[in-house]
């Protein structure tokens, strides 16, 4: 019975892309290789990052959200987020046979049918926009398709699950952020938010 279930799962994988919602490779590249793609080459096994092209393919990954995480206390969150997005864009150029940036659902399907991994960008923490709807819109134009509202700390507009509540959920500006994300078609990721924010 287990073999039959595995066969069904594999058949499903061939028809529908498995999309991994979070991969910290861009952060690992920043922290361990000074953003140098040659130092953590994805065509070779990467035991420290647990991510390489062979493993992604073997795991049946058809779509990958690359997390563009920056620390909540980063003094220049917009710049740091742009640098992380730049890493993802450079990955697409370095490995065009494996990855392509996907901006729409149709892109995901097309890339998957070509046997490549549809690559999407997820922002981990609303602090990345530095309380700017303009920054949010520009990140979307660069390919960000979800944003986690918080990470380990509150922002000026939303409470995190692991910080002392100051807003009891979303502020009026926080509601504007969510409305703008909905208008843009960005997923609102509730990981790390306080219960009141939900």
Model region roles, listed by residue range:
Residues 6, 171-172, 194:
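Ser/Thr-centered flexible coil motifs
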Residues 22, 194-198:
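Second-shell residues forming the walls of enzyme active-site clefts
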Residues 92-93, 166-185:
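Alpha-helix-loop-beta-strand connector modules within alpha/beta enzyme cores
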Residues 99-101, 186-193:
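Catalytic beta/alpha-barrel core
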Residues 135, 173-177, 197:
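Short, hydrophobic/aromatic alpha-helical segments in well-folded domains
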């Amino acid at each position: 019975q287990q073999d039959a279930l595995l066969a069904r799962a594999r058949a499903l994988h061939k028809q529908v892309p498995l999309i991994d919602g979070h991969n910290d490779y861009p952060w690992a590249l920043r922290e361990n290789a000074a953003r140098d793609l040659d130092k953590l080459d994805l065509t070779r096994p990467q035991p420290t990052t647990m991510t390489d092209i062979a493993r992604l393919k073997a795991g049946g990954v058809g779509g990958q959200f690359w997390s563009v995480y920056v620390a909540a206390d980063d003094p220049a969150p917009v710049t740091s987020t742009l640098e992380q997005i730049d890493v993802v864009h450079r990955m697409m150029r370095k490995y065009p046979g494996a990855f392509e940036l996907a901006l729409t659902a149709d892109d995901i399907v097309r890339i998957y049918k070509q046997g490549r991994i549809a690559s999407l960008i997820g922002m981990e923490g609303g602090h990345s926009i530095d309380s700017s709807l303009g920054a949010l819109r520009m990140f979307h134009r660069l390919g960000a398709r979800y944003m986690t509202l918080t990470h380990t700390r509150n922002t000026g507009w939303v409470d995190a699950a692991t910080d002392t509540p100051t807003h009891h959920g979303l502020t009026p500006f926080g509601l504007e952020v969510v409305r703008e994300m909905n208008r843009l078609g960005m997923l609102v990721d509730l990981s790390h938010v306080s219960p009141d924010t939900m």
